């Protein structure tokens, strides 16, 4: 099965819950996934279905669950959610007459199925707030319905029927009430592919904005567009977002498929001893694929790479006959040194010989002094894109690049995508949208042509000028 289209085992996916929150899970076979108050399900029950499918959790053995709750639970089963079964989630179907009425109505005035047989008021002037007494259905009744394995739609329908002043609400207020109850009692979830944009959205909703340097989805897309990421390119990248930008570049280069023979490669420069690419574990790429197409170098090795004489002075490879004569202990030590030798050769190649097809920088280091040194190995007519949380940093970088003839037209960009909230007769921006998103600087690496030499006038030209003067006289 294609992991880009179907739900397969050992795959990271993102689950969208009725409350609007998301959860990242790894689908290990023969295991269960708990969604808290929304229930739990077996992973094997959803394998093979297309990505984007919505499932509903239900329980058949309700009596057994109630009996288990009455028993004294063990210490490891105190907060354990009972595992239920899953089925395809289907919205409540409308009858033929209601469907015809909906088709005749304007698209902005479509009423939810649950509210089509419920009266509503044009205004809420007759609505009197008397608190919880307006609802005749108690929480004990709701819990009893849940223990009887009643679906969310059945519980919500009973709550609407038991509401004393529901018919005095406006249709818009009724829709908001219906939405809140679905978020509370529904037990469905949607399985989606964990793309880089979905991962960024999950991190922002979780509150890890500083982890991704306040990067927005629009800025992430602009980075790919301006850098002109291609499948056969070799790109230099400095990523301090935990590997999110590298994951996005891998998606654009390989499309989520593992092709070990693909020529594309990403060279990641890290300022610490070990690279921070923790988010690549959610990319569904194997470690073998990542090791081949993602090369990591420390910033010290890139700026001051070792020479070939220094590497060969510390270690010289042996022939096969000499290796076979070594004992087991010395052979393992030789293997470690040989691995170090090939690593140093790769460092020398990437830092001194390789020409890159683009440069992407998302770092908190001082960009005006960092970018010109990183861009020395970028090929001519190739883009350079720098991301920063603050415009002032990019302004200083732009002034530095303007005075250097190797960089063409540094431009600072800012992207904003403003979602709008719509209601009947109303349209305004979403009030809960977040600001920020960062800024981008974009330019091209060029190779300046040498200045033409100024030729001094020869003696022949001087003689001709003297003859012209004599004729004029």
Swiss-Prot record:
GO MF, one annotated term: RNA binding
GO biological process assignments: tRNA methylation
Localization, UniProt: Nucleus
Bias-annotated ranges (Acidic residues): 452-465
Primary location class: nucleus
The UniProt record lists the keyword Nucleus: yes
Keyword RNA-binding set for record: yes
Family the UniProt entry places it in: Belongs to the TRM6/GCD10 family.
Function: Substrate-binding subunit of tRNA (adenine-N(1)-)-methyltransferase, which catalyzes the formation of N(1)-methyladenine at position 58 (m1A58) in initiator methionyl-tRNA.
Protein's name according to its UniProt entry: tRNA (adenine(58)-N(1))-methyltransferase non-catalytic subunit TRM6
Annotated source species: Candida glabrata (strain ATCC 2001 / BCRC 20586 / JCM 3761 / NBRC 0622 / NRRL Y-65 / CBS 138) (Yeast)
């Amino acid at each position: 099965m294609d992991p880009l289209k179907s739900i397969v085992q050992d795959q990271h996916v993102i689950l969208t819950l009725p409350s609007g929150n998301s959860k990242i899970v790894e689908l290990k076979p023969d295991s269960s996934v708990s969604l808290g108050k929304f229930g739990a399900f077996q992973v094997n029950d959803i394998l093979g279905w297309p990505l984007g499918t919505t499932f509903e959790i239900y329980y058949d053995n309700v009596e057994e669950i109630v009996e288990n709750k009455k028993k004294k639970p063990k210490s490891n089963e105190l907060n354990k959610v009972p595992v239920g079964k899953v089925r395809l989630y289907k919205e409540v179907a409308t009858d033929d007459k209601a469907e015809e009425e909906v088709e005749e109505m304007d698209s902005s005035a479509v009423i939810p199925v649950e509210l089509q047989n419920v009266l509503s008021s044009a205004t809420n002037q007759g609505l009197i707030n008397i608190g919880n007494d307006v609802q005749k259905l108690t929480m004990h009744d709701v819990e009893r319905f849940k223990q009887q394995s009643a679906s969310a739609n059945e519980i919500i329908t009973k709550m609407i029927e038991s509401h004393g002043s529901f018919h005095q609400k406006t249709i818009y207020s009724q829709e908001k009430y219906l939405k809140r109850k679905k978020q509370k009692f529904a037990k469905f979830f949607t399985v989606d592919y964990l793309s880089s944009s979905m991962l960024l959205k999950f991190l922002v909703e979780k509150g890890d904005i500083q982890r991704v340097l306040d990067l927005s989805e629009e800025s992430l897309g602009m980075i790919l567009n301006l850098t002109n990421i291609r499948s056969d390119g070799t790109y230099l990248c400095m990523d301090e977002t935990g590997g999110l930008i590298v994951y996005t570049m891998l998606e654009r280069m390989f499309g989520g498929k593992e092709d070990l023979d693909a020529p594309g490669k990403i060279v990641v420069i890290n300022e610490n001893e070990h690279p921070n690419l923790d988010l690549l574990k959610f990319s569904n790429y194997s470690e073998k694929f990542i090791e081949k197409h993602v090369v990591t170098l420390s910033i010290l090795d890139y700026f001051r790479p070792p020479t070939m004489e220094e590497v060969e002075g510390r270690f010289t490879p042996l022939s096969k006959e000499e290796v076979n004569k070594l004992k087991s202990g010395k052979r393992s030590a030789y293997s470690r040194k040989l691995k170090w030798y090939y690593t140093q050769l790769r460092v020398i190649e990437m830092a001194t010989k390789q020409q890159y097809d683009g440069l992407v920088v998302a770092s908190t280091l001082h960009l005006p002094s960092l970018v010109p040194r990183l861009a020395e190995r970028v090929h001519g007519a190739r883009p350079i894109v720098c991301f920063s949380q603050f415009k002032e940093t990019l302004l200083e970088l732009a002034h530095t690049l303007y005075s250097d003839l190797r960089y063409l037209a540094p431009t600072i960009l800012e992207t904003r995508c403003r979602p709008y909230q719509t209601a009947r007769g109303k349209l305004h921006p979403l009030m809960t949208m977040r600001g920020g998103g960062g800024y981008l600087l974009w330019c091209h690496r060029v190779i300046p042509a040498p200045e033409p030499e100024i030729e001094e006038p020869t003696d022949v030209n001087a003689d001709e000028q003297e003859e012209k003067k004599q004729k004029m006289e």
